[in-house]
């Protein structure tokens, strides 16, 4: 939790860090990724058979090594909008017998050369957990049950045996399953009303948890503060008594919300992720309201929020049907840093967050035939995923604030926008980690930092100006490591992200 006191421009800023005040445990799944059959994410990104940089499975080795640097804990698959017409059975078995299908989300052709077994094997090579999204567009409950049985079944059943026939004896034990993707959207095949979806999701969840009670189910929400989110939570957040047990089984483990932010001007761009912070706060209250109104027993585990699509994305600048290949600048990197600060600050409520996407498609990581490019947005992800773990701890900032335009406009009325955006953690290793993002375009900010004593390791991400990118053959934005003796105030450079790290 970070609190804020607004100062005048003439007053001296300060930051106080309190490692003894632990707020909540951080779920490492907030650093999850996403791989959709869209653009060059799968074909030419994750999977590139015949390329000298690929292994015997066709997996790009340089992509695997890069994602290992990010310690990605979970990858969502196969979409996204793609899931609404995807039939998993097309993507298993001998490749020469897999059908090519028209793909209606991004208007391409899906060859099905990369499917369930390839993805789950790729996850094992990467060392990450899979998160599969069920087709609640053209798909059926029988198809969903079959997919769970194919992945997780241990009995002598048709689909578990089909998995064995296809070369995988042991179950994959896929834990996370989404009940559809953005089924409320007018762009979806088989768009649903909230009433239709809530009824369907409830019935599907019962059946899926009867088949495999160990799985966790993610409800399809909208942006969070909407009537869709309230209604679907209210209608599905009920204890269900299994005929096999007298204990109450929670149907819904997480509630999914999505949001993308972007603006052509720097300051509206870097303050836009605060809309996500307010969305999390409201969604958390809706979860509590549904539990209260439905009389859910307090001992039943409270669902968390699964922010399983988030990023900086301007769909005009990077059109989805054309592969959505963004060229990110320093301003976008700082916006991603603010997004990640939000997830750390709200760790009590966020059980998972998946940046969309992990390779090539609005991604921090781009591939060419000859290698990879780490975009500006790579560096905040790298720092957070490697250091901002453990516990969220209390921090207080005193600084002046940006008072101009926000995007969306309603952010101005509901969130403070200080010049310094801050989150703080205490790791299991006993180190305090503090991220400070100076969003000011033109001015470094000198602030007294209460908390550290002795040597402080400092990581800084910045560049010549907010518009510089790494996509023009030169790395304009990277990572610089220095040391600081913690004497006197610290100057946070203009348009920069700084991570300070010291032993508590």
From Swiss-Prot:
Pathway(s) the chain acts in: Glycan metabolism; L-arabinan degradation
Record-level Gene Ontology MF annotations: alpha-L-arabinofuranosidase activity
Listed Gene3D superfamilies: Glycosidases, Golgi alpha-mannosidase II
Main location, first listed in the record: secreted
Database matches in InterPro entries: Alpha-L-AF_C (IPR010720), Glyco_hydro_b (IPR013780), Glycoside_hydrolase_SF (IPR017853)
Protein keywords: Carbohydrate metabolism, Glycoprotein, Glycosidase, Hydrolase, Polysaccharide degradation, Secreted, Signal
Pfam families in UniProt: Alpha-L-AF_C
EC main group: hydrolase
E.C. number: 3.2.1.55
Source organism, top-level taxon: Eukaryota
Record's subcellular location: Secreted
BP-aspect Gene Ontology terms: arabinan catabolic process; arabinose metabolic process; L-arabinose metabolic process; pectin catabolic process; polysaccharide catabolic process
GO cellular component labels: extracellular region
Protein's UniProt name: Alpha-L-arabinofuranosidase C
Organism per entry: Emericella nidulans (strain FGSC A4 / ATCC 38163 / CBS 112.46 / NRRL 194 / M139)
């Amino acid at each position: 939790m970070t609190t804020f006191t607004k100062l005048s421009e003439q007053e001296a800023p300060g930051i106080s860090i309190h490692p003894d005040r632990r707020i909540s445990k951080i779920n490492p799944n907030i650093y999850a990724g996403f791989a959709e059959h869209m653009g060059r994410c799968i074909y030419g990104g994750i999977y590139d058979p015949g390329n000298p940089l690929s292994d015997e499975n066709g997996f790009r080795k340089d992509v695997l090594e890069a994602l290992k640097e990010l310690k990605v804990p979970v990858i969502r698959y196969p979409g996204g909008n793609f899931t609404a017409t995807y039939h998993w059975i097309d993507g298993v078995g001998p490749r020469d017998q897999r059908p090519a299908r028209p793909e209606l989300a991004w208007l391409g052709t899906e060859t099905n050369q990369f499917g369930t077994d390839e993805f789950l094997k790729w996850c094992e090579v990467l060392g990450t957990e899979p998160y599969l999204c069920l087709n609640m567009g053209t798909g059926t409950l029988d198809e969903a049950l079959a997919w769970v049985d194919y992945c997780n079944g241990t009995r002598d059943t048709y689909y578990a045996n089909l998995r064995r026939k296809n070369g995988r004896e042991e179950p994959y034990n896929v834990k996370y399953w989404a009940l559809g993707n953005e089924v409320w959207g007018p762009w979806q095949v088989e768009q649903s009303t909230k009433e239709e979806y809530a009824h369907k999701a409830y019935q599907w969840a019962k059946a899926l948890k009867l088949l495999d009670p160990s799985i966790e189910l993610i409800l399809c929400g909208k942006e969070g503060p909407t009537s869709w989110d309230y209604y679907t939570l209210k209608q599905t957040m009920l204890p269900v008594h299994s005929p096999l047990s007298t204990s109450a089984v929670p149907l819904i483990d997480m509630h999914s919300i999505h949001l993308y932010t972007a603006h052509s001007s720097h300051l509206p761009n870097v303050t836009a992720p605060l809309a996500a912070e307010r969305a999390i706060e409201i969604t958390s209250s809706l979860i509590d309201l549904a539990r209260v109104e439905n009389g859910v027993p307090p001992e039943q585990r409270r669902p968390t929020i699964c922010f399983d699509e988030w990023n900086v994305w301007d769909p005009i600048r990077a059109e989805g049907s054309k592969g959505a290949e963004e060229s990110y600048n320093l301003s976008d990197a700082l916006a991603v840093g603010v997004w990640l600060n939000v997830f750390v600050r709200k760790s009590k409520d966020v059980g998972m967050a998946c940046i969309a996407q992990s390779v090539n498609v609005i991604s921090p990581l781009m591939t060419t035939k000859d290698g990879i490019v780490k975009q500006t947005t790579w560096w905040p992800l790298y720092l957070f995923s490697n250091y901002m773990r453990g516990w969220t701890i209390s921090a207080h900032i005193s600084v002046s604030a940006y008072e101009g335009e926000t995007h969306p406009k309603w952010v101005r009325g509901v969130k403070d926008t200080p010049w310094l955006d801050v989150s703080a953690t205490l790791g299991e290793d006993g180190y305090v980690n503090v991220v400070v993002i100076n969003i000011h375009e033109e001015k470094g900010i000198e602030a007294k930092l209460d908390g550290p004593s002795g040597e402080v390791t400092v990581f800084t991400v910045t560049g010549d100006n907010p518009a510089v990118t790494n996509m023009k053959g030169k790395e304009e934005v990277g990572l610089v490591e220095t040391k600081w003796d913690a004497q006197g105030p610290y100057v946070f450079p203009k348009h920069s992200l700084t991570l300070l790290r010291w032993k508590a």
